[in-house]
């Protein structure tokens, strides 16, 4: 019996020690470092309006349906963050073909002047998460004609807006050149006022 207690005692102490270290101390240290070094990222990269209300995050896409605004990527989860993920159909899956055809039909309705062959792939396909906040600069540019026609904002102004909101690859190496749709639409909204 005494031998059992001598074995259990260190096990219980080690378990408790690691519970405190890994469950309390480590998370608090990492949270403190994140808040000190990169507060914006640690808080979720939130975007605020003029009234200091949260209107979104730079990291999570939103569904823009108003034809006067730029539209993001297709999302099979309708941009619901709690349902993150996508129906990652294989290229041979007929459901993928149906989904892409549906996206193309919607595109044609809203952008009749742009040939389907010029529609960038990121406007008719899902991202892996279904929450991608960015599109390619080309995907933004092909929407300029529709937006200009509906808002009466000159195409050149919209193209400059896209250029101003275009971000390069991280550290010049990682990722693609991209445009954050929420940030782009917020700048567009300023022009509409």
UniProtKB/Swiss-Prot annotation:
Record keyword Repressor present: no
GO MF term (any one): ATP binding
Protein topology in the membrane: Single-pass membrane protein
Function of the molecule: Part of the high-affinity ATP-driven potassium transport (or Kdp) system, which catalyzes the hydrolysis of ATP coupled with the electrogenic transport of potassium into the cytoplasm. This subunit acts as a catalytic chaperone that increases the ATP-binding affinity of the ATP-hydrolyzing subunit KdpB by the formation of a transient KdpB/KdpC/ATP ternary complex.
Any one GO CC term of the record: plasma membrane
Organism: Bacillus cereus (strain ZK / E33L)
Domain of life: Bacteria
Underlying gene: kdpC
Protein name from the UniProt record: Potassium-transporting ATPase KdpC subunit
Entries under Pfam families matching the protein: KdpC (PF02669)
Family from the record: Belongs to the KdpC family.
């Amino acid at each position: 019996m005494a031998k059992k207690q001598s074995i259990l005692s260190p096990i219980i102490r080690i378990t408790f020690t690691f519970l405190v270290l890994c469950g309390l101390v480590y998370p608090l240290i990492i949270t403190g470092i994140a808040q000190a070094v990169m507060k914006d990222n640690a808080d979720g990269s939130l975007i605020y309006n003029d009234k200091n209300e949260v209107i979104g995050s730079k990291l999570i896409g939103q569904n823009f349906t108003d034809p006067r605004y730029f539209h993001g990527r297709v999302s099979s989860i309708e941009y619901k963050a709690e349902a993150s993920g996508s129906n990652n159909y294989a290229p041979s899956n007929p459901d993928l073909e149906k989904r892409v055809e549906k996206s193309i039909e919607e595109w044609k309705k809203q952008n009749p002047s742009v040939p389907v062959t010029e529609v960038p792939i990121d406007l008719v396909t899902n991202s892996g998460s279904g929450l991608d906040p960015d599109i390619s600069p080309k995907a933004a540019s092909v929407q300029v004609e529709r937006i200009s026609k509906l808002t009466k904002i000159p195409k050149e102004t919209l193209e400059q807006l896209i250029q101003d909101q275009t971000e390069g690859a991280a550290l010049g190496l990682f990722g693609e050149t991209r445009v954050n749709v929420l940030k782009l639409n917020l700048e567009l909204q300023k022009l509409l006022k």
